[in-house]
Every structure is written in structure tokens, then in C-alpha cells.
Amino acid sequence: MSRSRQPPLVTGISPNEGIPWTKVTIRGENLGTGPTDLIGLTICGHNCLLTAEWMSASKIVCRVGQAKNDKGDIIVTTKSGGKGTSTVSFKLLKPEKIGILDQSAVWVDEMNYYDMRTDRNKGIPPLSLRPANPLGIEIEKCKLPQKNLEVLFHGMSADFTSENFSAAWYLIENHSTTSFEQLKMAVTNLKRQANKKSEGSLAYVKGGLSTFFEAQDALSAIHQKLEADGTEKVEGSMTQKLENVLNRASNTADTLFQEVLGRKDKADSTRNALNVLQRFKFLFNLPLNIKRNIQKGDYDVVINDYEKAKSLFGKTEVQVFKKYYAEVEAGIEDLRELLLKKLLETPSTLHDQKRYIRYLSDLHAPGDPAWQCIGAQHKWTLKLMQDCKEGHMKSLKGHPGPHSPMLDLDNDVRPSVLGHLSQTASLKRGSSFQSGRDDTWRYKTPHRVAFVEKLTKLVLSQLPNFWKLWISYVNGSLFSETAEKSGQSERSKNVRQRQNDFKKMIQEVMHSLVKLIRGALLPLSLREGDGRQYGGWEVQAELSGQWLAHVIQTIRLTYESLTALEIPNDMLQIIQDLILDLRIRCIMVTLQHTAEEIKRLAEKEDWVVDNEGLTSLPCQFEQSIVHSLQSLKGVVDCKPGEASVFQQPKTQEEVCQLCINIMQVFIYCLEQLSTKPDADIDTTHLSVDVSSPDLFGSIHEDFSLTSEQRLLIVLSNCCYLERHTFLNIAEHFEKHNFQGIEKITQVSMASLKELDQRLFENYIELKADPIVGSLEPGIYAGYFDWKDCLPPAGVRNYLKEALVNIIAVHAEVFTISKELVPRVLARVVEAVSEELSRLMQCVSSFSRNGALQARLEICALRDTVAIYLTSESRSSFKQALEALPQLASGADKKSLEELLNKFKSSMHLQLTCFQAASPAVMKT
């Protein structure tokens, strides 16, 4: 047997020495978890468990027993830790012997305590009693260890009445500190006592000497007289003479007392006749007495009288006796019928059932009343279960709302499962996103849940007594000893024949219990023929996952209670199958309800953005799933004997699909939020990162979210979901032993990425298209012609406007989420560079000034957004530059450089946002 605790260790005992029955306190570690855990305690090899009092895991109080060893360890043994060890020992001292005349606070067993050869005082004068202090001086007990004295005087004793008396040991033990002068006085006292004793004994003998002589003379005279009479030959020997005398005396006595002896014989015969009449009186009065005792319920008296009458008159041939005995048998037959009727009455306690069966057994009732009782109890249990269902259905029709069930069973054989309601894992659903409807579910029990509670309570109130009745029937304890001996072989045969019948009874009760619960909670799992008998509930709404988890806990407790009765597991397997189906159903319902809750999360989006550009929506989504999984922990975890809910591939697939559906529902919520009309958005509590620089002024409280800002917020949430939330949820699924996690993650990630890309493209389209569309009109504003233009004086306004628009996009994105800036600006720059490249390639020819102007503007744009360039945008800029003629002279190059520096200097403040460090990898 495996133990969960360390072995006991005794580290101290107080006191550490003493005589037997000394009260000691034992201290140590791991001395047991309670009084029932302590199963052994020995001190010096003696078992002291009977006197042990467990105080705590580190303290035990007990009394030392009559140990054989003088010194030994203190060994504590517990169920949880086994046999322990000791670092200390106890020394057992020999108790001082209490003298015959000494006062004592306890009773002394003198038969075992004193040596009767030396301590007896019957028939001898008081002077012969040995004094407690023979030396006559004060006794001072020695403090030397007893063990040392025993080693020093091996085989000797300090008891002066012992044959091995040692005077030296006696003096050391009682007079170790006595002075020499006192010892001299002690010798004088000892001599004086010896002389007094001798004188007293001699005087006693002298006083009774004359009595001894008189007795001797009388005995001698009797002996001589007998010898003289025996030698005479008068009428034979002395014995013959004595015989004749005795015979004459006898004859004379007969003559004298003949009349008296006659009267004695007559009195004896009269007495015998009266005794016989008294014996018959018992039989004559017995029928009336039987009726009276039956009315009073004194069945034991009736049975005893019947057994007595049966033994006296059962085989009589006297007609009068036969008549009265027949009346007795008729009364007993009525009693048998009455007892059988009471036995089969329901409800009845197990005690009464056993009592009636024993009475019927003593009365040798025909048939097998015990088996009849078992059958009646079985039918009664089935009827109660069906009545329970019908009663709740009537109550449901009369009161369709939830109610508090009235469990009217008096004897509850298990703790009420309502106490476990607050302990089921599902009840931790107190998050902020739950509505008030969940706050009252504890106090309103649905009818079907109340029915299951009452049904299981009913079964547990009936089945234990039913099972115990069968066990008593099997082992014969229902019957009296006489009935057991007379019908043992027949009953053994009946038990063997009825084992299968009883097994069918138990299975019928289990099947009825399971089908009634299935009819209430899982009606679709019933067969077509069982629907009317066990189903028929008017289901208005599906039970929530919390209530299903509570029902599972109720049935689990029922299963544990039935297992404790030692009912075979094969009879209870059907309950395990029910628990498995309910666990699967609970998981399905909980996940479906979770999907519905998550669908409503869109209504709770407050658009409050934290420093990372996130709203509370991803956190609420994760909390919702975590709470659902926590509520399912007790359901998913397997109790002893239970199978995993994911053992069937079909169940795995369904649960996996429900989990995927939950993730996709949330993704759909995000999509809804991104396309929600502006009028439906509440932005009164819009918040941004206070540390984010706002290039265009502060965002006020009455600022209204635009569709672009909503897209950015949703995109920011999508990024967080992909990097954190979905991975965390996958870990939670794995922690709770869910299957198909990889598939759930892959499908969810794919859907999320698809939404993210679609929303991103929408945002880029909203922001990049206006900028791209403004390039061509800006380039050719004022009838600008690349072939005929003035020398460049700087970057034209159209490019500055494009940069300002890009800066505005940067500011908008940066305000929501810093991490989205590289991704968004890279795509905007790609679109602008691609359009610029197209426009340059569409120009047929450039003048010298036109080529310089175009190169200036292309380089200015490229250098400004250099940190957001991608391979596509670099390629576009390269193609645009390749479409231009090469600079003709060094003067043009110098002019280009001067103009670029002038542009960067003049727009230094505006271009600062493009100088921040960007992540190395930009997602597009």
C-alpha cells in the first residue's frame, strides 16, 4: 500500500523514566493525521495503544505498561506512514513494593502481590509478622539506579523475606547515608526484636501444652476400647453386632412413622396431580394468550409459547389436548398471515423487515417470505421512481417556471448534491461580459434538474436497504439459529437459483433510473418504445452547461454511493454510459453557448484603445473561452472507472468543429465591427495612447471614429489575435485535454489571416487611391510640359501634397497602433512609386530641365520614404529613374544635390516621422 506521508519519528518523551503506568507525553514528527490513523504504539516492547490519546501530529499522551525490557525505544505506527523510528528511549523503573500494613491509594491484589509462604499471618501470633523497618531507624531511599544494583548483586535481592536476601544491597538501598552510630543502634534494635519474638513463641507453646496432652489421652482410650471389643465373640464380630442394632432401629422407626409416611405419599401424589393440572392449564389458556399477545405486538412471547406447546403436545393422542392444540395452530396460522402482510407492506424499514422475516422463520411459515419481501421491495422502488417522474411532470404543467424542489425524503443517505453546486467548475462564470441572467441560476432549479436530484436521492434511500436485505438473505442472518439449521440446505439451493433473479432486479432498477434521466435530459437517446414511458417532458429551453455539469456531479455521487455498497461493476456500467453521454452533451452545449456569448461581444465593443492599439475585445474573447473551459474541467476530467469523452473519433470531430466555429464567430464579429455604419459607433469614450505624438492636434472626446480608424483598430486586434490570443487559446485547449488542437489553430489562423488581408486591402484602397490619383493632375498642373519647362527651382507642390497626405496616413495609423505603421506606409509607398513610375514611362521625351526636375522629385520622394521601401517600391523607383535621360554634366548633378538638400531642410519638421526606426520585417 502506497503511503503519502513520511514514517513517524519520535524525538522526545517526558518523563524519560518511570514505573509502569506512568503517564508520559510523546513528541515527534508525522505521528498520524488523527486518532483513527494511529494503529500502533510500543514503549520498551509493550503495546500501549489502549491508553494512547492522540493530541496532534506531533504529540501523543499515553501510560507505560508492564514491559519486560528495562529500557527501550518508543515506536509509533500509523496507517499513513507505517512503522516509525525513535531517537530517544524510555527507562522503566521497578515499583516499590507496598507492605501489608502500608496505606495505598490504589487496590493491591494480595494474592499475586505477596508471597504467601512469607506473608501469611493466619494461625500465628502477631509477633511473627515481619516489620516493614526491621532496623528501627529512619529509612532513606538510595538514588542509585536500580539496574546498577542488580548488576552489582547479581542473583541477590534486597527483600529481607527473600531466600536470596543480601544485607549489603538492603543497606545501600535503604540506609546509604546512615551514620555508623545509627547502624549500631539498629543492631541493638534488631537483637531486641529477635529476643522478643523467641519469648513470645515459647509462651504461646507453653499456654497450649495441657490441651495437647488431654487430646492425646482421649485418642489413646478410644483406640484401646475398639481393640478390646473387636476380640470378643459375642454374637459375632463388632460390625455384625452393630448391623443388628441398626436393623432393629430401622424396623422400629418404620412402625412408628408408617402413618406419617402414608400421608407423605398421598401428599406427593396430590402435588404431582396439581403439577399436571398446571401443565394443562398452560395449554388451555394458550389460545387466548396468543390473541392477547398478538394484539399487543408481543410476537416473541407468542413464538416462545408456541414452541413450548409444540414440544409438549405436538404429538399427543389425547383428544382434549388435540382440540386445544388445534386452536393454537389456528392462531399461529393467523399470526403467519399477519406477519407476512406486515412484511410486504411498503414503505418499511430494514429493521422491521428483518424482524418479521425472523418471526416467520421461527414459525416455519411456508414458502420463502424473505424472497417475497425482496420482490415487493423491488416493485415498490420501481413504482416510486415512476411516481417521482409523474409528480414532477404534473408540477411542471401547473407551474411551468423554475422552482425550488421539495425533496420530501426523510432519510438522506448521501450529502445533498446542492452543496456541490457552487463547487462545479462551471460556476466560475462571473466575468464582466455576462449578463444578469446568470446571477440567479443558483437559486432557481429547473424542473428536470430537480427531478434528477430527487430521483437519485430516492434510489439511494431505497437501494442500500434493498441490497443489504439481499446480503442478509444470502448469508442466512435473516433467520434464527434453529430455523437456519433446519432449512439450511433448502435455502442454499434457493439462493443459488435466485442469484440471477436478483441480478435482473438490480439491473431493472438501474435501467429504469438511467432511462428516466435520459428521458429528462437526453430524450433523443431513448428507443422509440421507451419514449412514452420514460420521456414526455415538455422542454421549453435547453439546459445550460452549468446545470448539466451539476447533474453530472449528482449522478457521479450516486454512482460512488452505489459502488460503496459493493454492487458489482457490471450492474453499474449503464450508469457510467449515462455519465459519458451527459459529459459529451455538456461539452457540446457549453461550447454552443460560448459561441452565442461571443457573437454578442460585438455589442460590447467600446473602441477604447490602449497603448498597444488594442481594445478589450480580444481579452474578453479569451476570457470567455477560458471560463468555458474551466467550467468543463470537472466534466472533461475522468473519475475512477470513467472513459475519456474524446475516445470516440466522432466526438472528437464534433468538438473540434464547435471550437473552430467559436473562433470563426469571433472573426465574423470583427468583420462586422469593421463595416459597422458610423452612426452606430459610440466614440464618447475613445482613448488613445497619451505618449503617441499627434501631428495634427489633440483628439478630443467628441471625436467621431471614421471607417478608416475602425479598420485600423480591427487590424490591430487581428495582429494581436494572431500573435498571442489564438496561441493562448490553443494552450488552454491542450491544458484541458481537448483533441484536434492543431486543426483548430490552422483553420482559425487561416480565417483570421484572410480577414486581416481583406481589411488591410480595404484600408490601403481608402488611403492610397486618393494620393495616387492626385499625382498625375499635380504633375501637369498649369500646363506643365516635360519638354518645355524652366530650370527646376525645387520640388513642386504636388509632391509636397502627396508627402503631406502620406504623413497624415502615418499620423492616423501611429495614433491607433505603432506596429501597423511600417506595414501600411510600405503599401502606400508601393502604390505611389508604382504610379510615379507609370507616369514617367508614359512621357515620350524630356528636356534637359524636365529630366532634372523629374529626377529631383523622384529622388526626393525616394529618399524621404527610404525606411518604408520594399523590393517592389525600389523596383518602381528604379524603373522611373531609368525612364529619364542621364544627367548631362556635373553641374546638373550638383544642382540636383543642392535642390534635394534645400527640400529636406525646408520640410525637416514634416519629414521627421519618416526618420523613426522601423521593424526589419514588414508584413504586407
Curated annotation (Swiss-Prot):
Species of the source: Mus musculus (Mouse)
Residues that the record marks as modified (N6-acetyllysine) are 454
Q: What is this protein called?
A: Exocyst complex component 2
| Domain topic, free-text comment | Interacts with RALA through the TIG domain.
Phosphothreonine-modified residues are where?
Answer: 440
How is this protein organized at the quaternary level? The exocyst complex is composed of EXOC1, EXOC2, EXOC3, EXOC4, EXOC5, EXOC6, EXOC7 and EXOC8. Interacts with EXOC3L1. Interacts with GNEFR/DELGEF; this interaction occurs only in the presence of magnesium or manganese and is stimulated by dCTP or GTP. Interacts with RALA and RALB. Interacts with ARL13B; regulates ARL13B localization to the cilium membrane.
**What biological function has been recorded for the protein in this entry?**
Component of the exocyst complex involved in the docking of exocytic vesicles with fusion sites on the plasma membrane.
**A GO BP entry:** vesicle docking involved in exocytosis
Q: Where in the cell is it found?
A: Midbody, Midbody ring
Which keywords are on file for this protein?
Acetylation, Coiled coil, Exocytosis, Phosphoprotein, Protein transport, Transport
Which intervals hold domain IPT/TIG? 8-93
Is Repeat among the key words of this record?
A: no
Mainly resides where? Answer: other
Tell me which family the UniProt entry assigns to this protein: Belongs to the SEC5 family.
Query: Pfam families recorded for this chain?
Result: Sec5, TIG
Q: Which residues form a coiled coil?
A: 240-260
CDD domains registered for this protein in UniProt: IPT_PCSR
Q: Which residues does this entry mark as bearing Phosphoserine? A: 431-432, 435
Report the GO terms under cellular component: exocyst; Flemming body; plasma membrane
Q: Which GO terms describe its molecular function?
A: protein kinase binding; small GTPase binding
What gene is this protein translated from? Exoc2
